[in-house]
């Protein structure tokens, strides 16, 4: 996780905040900010066609939502989503959460929200055919956790880091080696991406470093290119049939330079098909 548990009080200082108010007041203030944002409007608009199918929200890696500034905003977003489903579909949605760093206070608080709020380390969709019934919310989840869930579950709606930008530090070959399921989905996204996006993320064709003293005697055109052998994506994670981005919030413009700072940086709503 990116955030470590440390104390129970908070004031906004970098990643931490301090409560001059009660936690509920802070969350409500954050929710009021979100309600006025183009970000939330965009998200709810793109969730609207799927509301009838969503029966559960699985939220993992949210962090210490009563202590950390980003996690508090992420928790406020989770509440906005659950309330929106209730207002539109007249039903409560089940919320399944887990993070190993939850404090006793946070666990007690979640239990106080009612029987629809569950703390579950192990999570399994009851019916593989009904995979569209779960909305996954993984704010700032590490790649290992992302790969694990993609491998063990059948997520359809995936609200998490943008799969392309979150993995762009890896070559295609290295991504496939370390995170094969994620690699397959990134391949789908890049295949359907606009030309300028493909070019920006085509990290496999890079020039070999040549010391300055040797460059003097070489023509730029002679620099070697490292190109991995073609990857057989058809043989990787065959359960996946496609992946698309439903919204990246106007290429992240709705997420930047806002009161929530980096709480939602790189957040994207994906749809995975099987």
From Swiss-Prot:
Superkingdom of origin organism? Eukaryota
An annotated GO BP? microtubule-based process
Q: Which UniProt keywords apply?
A: Cytoplasm, Cytoskeleton, Microtubule
Provide one Gene Ontology cellular component.
cytoplasm
Name the Pfam families on file: SRR1
Q: Where in the cell is it found?
A: Cytoplasm, Cytoskeleton
PANTHER family, from UniProt?
SRR1-LIKE PROTEIN (PTHR28626:SF3)
Name the protein family.
Belongs to the SRR1 family.
Q: What else is known?
A: Present with 6490 molecules/cell in log phase SD medium.
Function field: Involved in microtubule stability and kinetochore function. May be involved in protein N-terminus acetylation and/or proteasome biogenesis.
Protein's name in the database: SRR1-like protein BER1
Gene encoding the protein: BER1
């Amino acid at each position: 996780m990116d955030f470590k548990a440390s104390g129970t009080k908070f004031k906004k200082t970098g990643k931490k905040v301090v409560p001059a108010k009660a936690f509920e007041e802070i969350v409500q203030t954050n929710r009021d900010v979100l309600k006025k944002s183009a970000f939330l409007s965009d998200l709810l608009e793109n969730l609207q066609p799927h509301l009838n199918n969503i029966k559960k929200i699985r939220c993992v890696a949210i962090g210490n939502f009563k202590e950390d500034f980003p996690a508090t905003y992420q928790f406020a977003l989770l509440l906005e989503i659950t309330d929106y489903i209730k207002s539109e579909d007249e039903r409560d949605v089940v919320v399944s959460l887990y993070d190993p760093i939850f404090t006793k206070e946070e666990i007690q608080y979640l239990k106080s929200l009612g029987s629809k709020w569950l703390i579950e380390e192990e999570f399994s969709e009851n019916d593989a055919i009904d995979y569209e019934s779960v909305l996954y919310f993984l704010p700032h989840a590490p790649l290992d956790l992302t790969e694990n869930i993609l491998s063990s579950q059948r997520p359809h709606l995936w609200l998490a880091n943008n799969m392309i930008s979150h993995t762009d530090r890896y070559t295609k070959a290295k991504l496939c080696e370390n995170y094969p399921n994620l690699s397959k989905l990134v391949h789908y996204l890049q295949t359907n991406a606009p030309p300028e996006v493909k070019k920006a993320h085509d990290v496999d064709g890079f020039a070999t470093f040549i010391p300055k003293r040797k460059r003097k005697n070489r023509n730029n055109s002679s620099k070697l290119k490292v190109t991995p052998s073609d990857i057989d994506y058809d043989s990787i994670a065959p359960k996946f049939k496609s992946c698309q981005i439903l919204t990246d919030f106007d290429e992240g413009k709705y997420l930047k330079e806002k009161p929530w700072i980096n709480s939602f940086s790189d957040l994207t709503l994906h749809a995975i098909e099987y």
